Amino acid sequence: MQDRPTSVELLEAAADFVDRELVPTIEGARQFQARVVANVMRIVAREIKLEDPLARSEVKALARLLEHDAPHLHSLDDLRVAAARMGEELTAKIRAGDADGGSWRGEVLAVVRQSVEDKLRIANPRYLENDIAVRGAEKARKEI
């Protein structure tokens, strides 16, 4: 266990420095590249914070969907491997038409949607927030 600042805090501080101190002082392609660097640091920070719990949730959901016993995995690497294998199995079932109809289709859509949302929580949470806001507005319009 490391003392503070944590790796996440260091990445967030570095990203803030790039945005506040460097980006305003440069122009053109270099400014764009600096913004990309800050964004990458924030993505890595979110991944460090969120990847383990999100991977555990994904493995559990895929195991339930595919009717496997939920594996008791401890390392993040093992979770990644299990998620990839079950993801490939689900992909094969979808390609075979197993999710074209019936109640399982709804379950598949729910699991896939959650997986995409979890990936967006790391890669681009603002997109996810905007999507949720748009869906909420559409739902409200339908209720009127």
Predicted regions mapped to residue ranges:
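Short, charged early-sequence alpha-helical segments and their helix-coil boundaries
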Residues: 47-64
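Short alpha-helical segments enriched in small residues
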Residues: 3, 7
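C-terminal amphipathic alpha-helical interaction region
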Residues: 8-9, 14, 30, 59-144
